[in-house]
Each structure stands twice: as structure tokens, then as C-alpha cells.
Design a protein with these regions (language model features):
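Short polar/charged helix/loop
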Residues: 1-137
Length: 137
């Protein structure tokens, strides 16, 4: 969802930035999650691409900022993929309502309400990031 939200918000601001989305575990052979797609559609956000992407498939050296939901994701980017800590940010750090720096993955909830709350939190954090990110100026 974060990728879909960031693409939409960047487009609203006419930002010309490359946006990638990937997991630290390889689920590239799995279909997109129905819950993610239906939540995005509920908020009139085009849903994510056809299949999940694994971080190892990305052009890692060319990416300036990695936004992650949980510290475990940041740790994996550093230890498994050699990404310097100064290029990684917890998305929750940009939450204007300060609800916490980590955002729980709604996957295991299987709950429409949880997915919608996650969407709204992620959207708020992405807007906060876009409003404050020095690398976008």
C-alpha cells in the first residue's frame, strides 16, 4: 500500500522521483494481496503492481532513501543488503500525529478495518515525509 500511496502523493505534487517497493523476503512468486488491493481501491488509490518485488531485484545503489515500516526491515537492509543506515528511515518518524515510529504490518490481521487504519497511518506518514524531506528539495 505504501508504494501505491507514495506514487499518488508524488504525482499530486508533480514530483519526478523513482519509487520502488519491495520486501526483505522474496515473495515474488506470490500474487498481490487481495486485502491490499481492495483497501487501495476503497481510497481511490490505484492498487499495487501485478506481483510482489524482492529488495534484491532493485537497483539498490541508485536509491537515495529507503522508507521502512518496522525496525526489523531497516536492520535487514543494513545487514543483508549493505544499505547504509543514513539512507534508511522509519516511515513512522514522519507521522504528524506521532503515533509511533514503527507501523505494524496489517497482513496477519486479515481485517478490513485494520488494513484501512494502516492505509490512513501510512498515508499520513508519507505526506509528512514529502512535506519535510530535504532530499526532495
Amino acid at each position: 500500500m505504501a508504494h501505491a500511496i507514495l506514487v499518488g502523493e508524488a504525482r499530486k505534487r508533480s514530483l519526478s522521483i523513482d519509487i520502488y517497493s519491495a520486501g526483505i523476503r522474496d515473495f515474488s512468486d506470490q500474487p498481490p494481496l487481495i486485502e491490499t488491493s481492495s483497501t487501495c481501491l476503497h481510497y481511490n488509490t490505484p492498487p499495487p503492481k501485478v506481483r510482489p518485488t524482492w529488495v534484491g531485484e532493485l537497483p539498490l545503489r541508485s536509491i537515495d532513501r529507503f522508507l521502512v515500516m518496522e525496525q526489523v526491515h531497516a536492520d535487514a537492509l543494513e545487514s543483508e543488503f549493505g544499505i547504509p543506515a543514513d539512507r534508511i528511515s522509519l516511515l513512522g518518524e514522519f507521522d504528524p500525529k506521532h503515533r509511533g515510529i514503527e507501523i505494524d504490518d496489517p497482513f496477519f490481521s486479515y481485517s478490513e478495518q485494520t488494513y484501512r487504519k494502516s492505509y490512513e497511518l501510512i498515508r499520513d506518514c508519507i505526506i509528512g515525509y514529502l512535506d519535510t524531506a530535504d532530499e526532495l528539495r
